[in-house]
Amino acid sequence: MKVVLQRVSEASVDVVNELGTLDPTFEPQQIGPGFMILVGVTDEDGDKQIAWLAHKILNLRVFEDAQGKMNRSIQDIGGEILSISQFTLFADVHKGNRPSFIKAGKPEHADLMWIKFNEALRSGGVPVKEGRFGAHMRVGLVNDGPVTIVIDTEHDMPDGTR
């Protein structure tokens, strides 16, 4: 799994239908201070990656304390998460000018892993709002910092836990 995490003061998502207008079947989602995360899944990802990544995000100390140091977690500040599934995080651009997405997980597997991942985040007591898997979305955010961190279970998980 790969996550691009951005610390935000606010973020929102809408779903756009095939006519290019807002999809009336999707209720727009908004959060206040917290994280907007883009989530990519491969076919090799499973429960171990979900548990490790959710724990890492819930405990990541990137919010400032009274002394202005990044020393507080999203749980500490009572923040929220906006989770957006994004297969394009696994784009391969080595050959030519058109990206290949062969490394991205198959939709059925990726959707299930994304749902389980969001539940793992919620189990840490943090409200999680979501986009719609596989949909064309408009995502808005106000970066705070900015603080942007890429976490990739393939490279960041300690050996022996993958």
UniProtKB/Swiss-Prot annotation:
Pfam families attached to this UniProt entry: Tyr_Deacylase
Entry EC no(s): 3.1.1.96
Primary residence: cytoplasm
Signal peptide positions on this chain: none
GO biological process, one term: D-amino acid catabolic process
InterPro entries (UniProt xref): Daa-tRNA_deacyls_DTD, DTD-like_sf
Name by which UniProt lists this protein: D-aminoacyl-tRNA deacylase
Entry keyword annotation includes RNA-binding: yes
Keyword annotations: Cytoplasm, Hydrolase, RNA-binding, tRNA-binding
GO molecular-function terms, A-Z: D-tyrosyl-tRNA(Tyr) deacylase activity; Gly-tRNA(Ala) deacylase activity; Ser(Gly)-tRNA(Ala) hydrolase activity; tRNA binding
Known partners and oligomeric status: Homodimer.
Domain notes: A Gly-cisPro motif from one monomer fits into the active site of the other monomer to allow specific chiral rejection of L-amino acids.
Underlying gene: dtd
Cellular-component GO terms for this entry: cytoplasm
Function, in words: An aminoacyl-tRNA editing enzyme that deacylates mischarged D-aminoacyl-tRNAs. Also deacylates mischarged glycyl-tRNA(Ala), protecting cells against glycine mischarging by AlaRS. Acts via tRNA-based rather than protein-based catalysis; rejects L-amino acids rather than detecting D-amino acids in the active site. By recycling D-aminoacyl-tRNA to D-amino acids and free tRNA molecules, this enzyme counteracts the toxicity associated with the formation of D-aminoacyl-tRNA entities in vivo and helps enforce protein L-homochirality.
Cell location: Cytoplasm
Motif Gly-cisPro motif, important for rejection of L-amino acids boundaries: 145-146
